[in-house]
UniProtKB/Swiss-Prot annotation:
GO biological process: ATP synthesis coupled electron transport; electron transport coupled proton transport
Biological classification of the source: Eukaryota, Viridiplantae, Streptophyta, Embryophyta, Tracheophyta
Main location: plastid
Origin species: Brachypodium distachyon (Purple false brome)
UniProt subcellular location: Plastid, Chloroplast thylakoid membrane
Pfam families in the cross-refs: Proton_antipo_C (PF01010), Proton_antipo_M (PF00361), Proton_antipo_N (PF00662)
Protein name listed in UniProt: NAD(P)H-quinone oxidoreductase subunit 5, chloroplastic
Length: 741
């Protein structure tokens, strides 16, 4: 066992030889390296698999009751200061190692098929392998300096992958947006690290936690500087994990390739912020004000993310807002001290969300040959529908992933989300109400994605394309009926003859339909050329295999949080779980063990209430977006409901406001653009005017005045010495007159 821990430092370095080999190959033999580029996927997967084997062994040892191991190498700068580097193996590290390696392997396999025809195939594998190295180094770091170093590497890799297709202006802009937004959090993290070093004189977790224990007897009463430094550390996690108000970069990050979206949302970029808070939770627990602030930010984020996902038309952006909301649940759990529930949800959400993102990539991959390679079309749910007939394997995997995120038992996310909801109700009814209501919203917008993508008819055949702006924008009504008048007409989905609102399932097909599955029709692309298309088809085995493996994780990973100690269950208290055995040292450290047990009756009651909210959300989504909408439309119920003046109808106005709020991202991006972008631009223009008009004006004015005076004076003397003597005596006389008087 000791032997395994001694060589644990190898885990982050295992993927490095492949990166170096690809780099040297591109430098020395570029043509051969590019011609045989797909062979590099095998060593990438192989070495990360070896890292996974090491991680599994470490995790098993942690579950069996091993203690925390830390190895340090000291780098002495002078007699008074030494900088230590090393690695830390504890339950949190082992969980993150398992998560990163398993999801990373599946994403690498998936990427081999998804990126096979991309010119940047090798560059993508270099970036993604280095991404895995950075995250593995982050979770094994033994002090704050190492965390910050790998924190920056994780950010750098994410920026490179978000802007992978940098020739597209939108992707380049998304990369810049992610960079600038995360700079705010990273700067706060750096200041917080330096502040705690100034307070405690150490950057080691052990020393920080020992100092924090001294604050607890004082009822958390600490200096303002300590609270400020803790807030700055939290600011880093806010930006990295896309929490309000620094969440704006996450939806735009979907401009990167879909495999990296899965990795960012499951196991790397956004998980880094949650990991940082979990690692430093013993420090934050001693600061009640910061803990309350963390829970408040998490609550705002989980609700905001759910509301912003309600009316999005881009499938990946909707999933991005879903990730933002689920990260809010984890942040809320950490803020109320529910350490185990937060990590449990981090695990279950990672596999379910990776399944959904890779499933969306399979959908996009099947749509691109038909609609083109523009994300506005291939990712637009307005052009999908009825895909269950054409990509059944993807549809099955996506459905189970959707139900898991919604919280349907016995899928993975049900167990973790239900634990967070129970703990939030125990901590504060305010947090419990918002978290429970958001669970219903989650079911609504997630099932909306599924219905718009797989239910009904394949709507692309009814869409008229043109090169005009009106023909290139599509949208989705929030409630399934006609777009409100307040929304721009550019967002209406229509055909050449009449408007077709695609959420209705009784769309009339053009005459001569026949066997439309085998029909080949022409359509006009945005380039104005005529082409032919068929229906979407299932992707290759290299893309389907990761979906099936993630589907198994979605089914069974939740059981690590289910009690298996029958004797304890007989006493009416929740028994020991695999996760609780895994986290025993950490739970003891955060003093959560007494709060994590819950009566069996309470568990069943809470589960029934949460599942009822989820079923209600699913039912409402089915009413507005499923086959049931056609039934209600045929009954003319909606027309009778709006028979009065619809503009004066309260429901109509609320619906329009919600749609506008959600579709426009809560107007937060617009607010930031006007406040910061336009404000800073105006400030720079004012500064430029002051610099050129005032500062340069004074300097240039003095020079110009001297020049003009000199030009006038030079004609006075005329070159005669008598004139010079005359003026000299006159000036001396005047000077003496004023001086003597």
């Amino acid at each position: 066992m000791e032997h395994t821990y001694q060589y644990a430092w190898v885990i982050p370095l295992l993927p490095l030889p492949v990166i170096l080999s690809m780099g040297f190959g591109l430098f020395l033999i570029p043509i051969a390296t590019k011609n045989f580029r797909r062979i590099w996927a095998f060593p990438s997967v192989l070495l990360l698999s070896i890292a996974m084997v090491f991680s599994v062994q470490l995790s098993i040892q942690q579950i069996n009751g091993s203690s925390i191991y830390q190895y340090l190498w000291s780098w002495t700068i002078n007699n008074d200061f030494s900088l230590e580097f090393g690695y830390l193996i504890d339950p949190l590290t082992s969980i993150m190692l398992m998560l990163i390696t398993t999801v990373g392997i599946l994403v690498l396999i998936y990427s081999d098929g998804y990126m096979s025809h991309d010119e940047g195939y090798l560059r993508f594998f270099i970036y993604i392998s280095f991404f895995n190295i950075s995250m593995l180094g982050l979770v094994t770091s033994s002090n704050l300096i190492q965390i910050y170093f790998f924190w920056e590497l994780v950010g750098m890799c994410s920026y490179l992958l978000i802007g992978f297709w940098f020739t597209r202006p939108i992707a380049a802009s998304a990369c810049q947006k992610a960079f600038v937004t995360n700079r705010i959090g990273d700067f706060g993290l750096l200041l917080g690290i330096l502040g705690f070093f100034w307070i405690t004189g150490s950057l080691e977790f052990r020393d920080l936690f020992q100092t924090a224990n001294n604050w607890i007897p004082n009822n958390g009463t600490t200096s303002l500087l300590t609270t400020l430094c803790a807030f700055l550390l939290f600011l880093g996690a806010v930006a990295k994990s896309a929490q309000f108000p620094l969440h704006v970069w996450l939806p735009d990050a979907m401009e990167g390739p879909t495999p990296i979206s899965a990795l960012i949302h499951a196991a790397t970029m956004v998980a880094a912020g949650i990991f940082l808070l979990a690692r430093l939770l013993p420090l934050f627990i001693s600061l009640p004000l910061i803990m309350t602030f963390i829970s408040l930010v998490g609550t705002i984020t989980l609700f905001l993310g759910a509301t912003l996902a309600l009316a999005q038309r881009d499938i990946k952006r909707t999933l991005a807002y879903s990730t933002m909301s689920q990260l809010g649940y984890m942040m809320l759990a950490l803020g109320i001290g529910s350490y185990q529930a937060a990590l449990f949800h981090l695990i279950t959400h990672a596999y379910s969300k990776a399944l959904l993102f890779l499933g969306s990539g399979s959908i996009i991959h099947s749509m691109e040959p038909l609609v083109g390679y523009s994300p506005d079309k291939s990712q637009n749910m307005a052009l999908m529908g009825g895909l269950r007939k054409y990509i059944p394997i993807t549809r099955t995997a996506f459905l189970w992933g959707t139900l898991s995120i919604c919280g349907i038992p016995p899928l993975a996310c049900f167990w973790s989300k239900d634990e967070i909801l129970s703990n939030s109700w125990l901590y504060s009814p305010f947090f419990g109400i918002i978290a429970s209501f958001t669970a219903g919203l989650t079911a609504f917008y997630m099932f909306r994605i599924y219905l718009l993508t797989f239910d009904g008819y394949f709507r692309f055949h009814f869409q008229n394309y043109s090169s005009t702006k009106e023909g290139s924008l599509y949208s989705i009504s929030l409630w399934g009926n006609r777009i409100p008048k307040g929304v721009s007409k550019d967002f209406v989905l229509s055909t050449t003859k009449s408007e077709v609102y695609f959420f209705s399932q009784n769309i009339s097909i053009s005459k001569g339909q026949g066997n439309t599955r085998n029909r080949i029709e022409s359509f006009s692309t945005s380039f104005g050329s005529k082409n032919v298309f068929t229906y979407p088809h299932e992707t290759g085995n290299t893309m389907l295999f990761p979906l099936l493996i993630l589907l198994l994780f979605t089914f069974f990973i939740g059981f690590i949080g289910i009690p298996f100690d029958n004797e304890t269950m007989d006493n009416g208290i929740a028994g020991v779980t695999i996760l609780s055995k895994w986290l025993i040292p950490s739970i003891n450290f955060t003093q959560e063990s007494s709060n994590s047990s819950i009566n069996s009756y309470e568990f069943i009651t809470n589960a029934i209430s949460s599942v009822s909210l989820v079923i209600l959300g699913l039912f409402i989504a089915y009413i507005f977006y499923g086959s049931a909408y056609s039934f209600f439309q045929n009954l003319d119920l909606q027309n009778s409901f709006y028979k009065g003046s619809p503009k004066k109808n309260f429901f109509y106005q609320v619906k329009k406001k919600i749609y506008s709020w959600s579709y426009n991202r809560g107007y937060i991006d617009i607010f930031y653009s006007r406040l910061f972008t336009l404000g800073i631009r105006g400030l720079t223009e004012l500064t430029e005017f002051f610099d050129k008009g005032v500062i340069d004006g004074i300097t240039n004015g003095v020079g110009l005045a001297s020049f003009c005076i000199g030009e006038e004076i030079k004609y006075v003397g005329g070159g005669r010495i008598s004139s010079y003597l005359f003026f000299f005596l006159c000036y001396v006389s005047v000077f003496l007159f004023f001086f003597l008087s």
